[in-house]
């Protein structure tokens, strides 16, 4: 299969680390022009330099904060307008909310999570969807979580917001399909990212055990008996962004080694 993304422009959220960074590298390797989104200028600059060293594709960066959706919308729209750029593919990806029980979460924690995920993604949609409709092409891929299918213990706020994003996505897939815009979700399971390492560290501290013991326990719950690498999730994103997935719309695709028990 030839995943040729030459002349496609891809907006990558959370592009300096984990699944976002793995996706950026993979899409660049297949010919895409990239706009990397993150909130750390130094990391953005470093990542852009790394990509520019291995590809002649256009690599651009934009410092945005997903906790401030109004500011994100303004920055992105001005960035695209000032350079007459259009976006073909969006990878919505940002860090998860803090862990904890849902019944102990404050309303501010829920509001913050909704802003960081659902509202920010909706703001991005508002900026890019008009051009996608005019060109009769678009791919919107949301990196969320297997908690959409099976809530995860100790991640109450995350479970709540991921479900909201999944339903937002499904609704959009019904509304935008006629414009040849597909909207799909990728649901990573336990993946070797800084987010997972944070969860492991916090769980180990609470249980007063070694971090490796917690990590091994997570891996033991997966039929494949290991934790995923970010690149394995990125390949699923690449497929959904490609022409090979032109008739795949409105799905939740688990990339979890079979850990989720539901169909």
Task: Set out the residue ranges of the language-model regions.
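Short, small/polar-rich loop/turn modules that mediate ligand/substrate recognition or access, typified
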Residues: 177, 182, 248-250
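Conserved NAD(P)H cofactor-binding loop of Rossmann-fold oxidoreductase domains
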Residues: 93-98, 258
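Conserved glycine-rich Rossmann-like NAD(P)H-binding loop of the short-chain dehydrogenase/reductase
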Residues: 32-47
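Catalytic Tyr-X3-Lys loop
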Residues: 96, 103-123, 137, 141, ...
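Conserved glycine-rich cofactor-binding loop
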Residues: 9, 16-18
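A conserved structural motif in NAD(P)-dependent oxidoreductases
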Residues: 210-211, 222-233
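Short C-terminal tail/terminal secondary-structure segment
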Residues: 4, 19, 150, 237-238, ...
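Catalytic loop of short-chain dehydrogenase/reductase
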Residues: 141-165, 169-178, 190-191
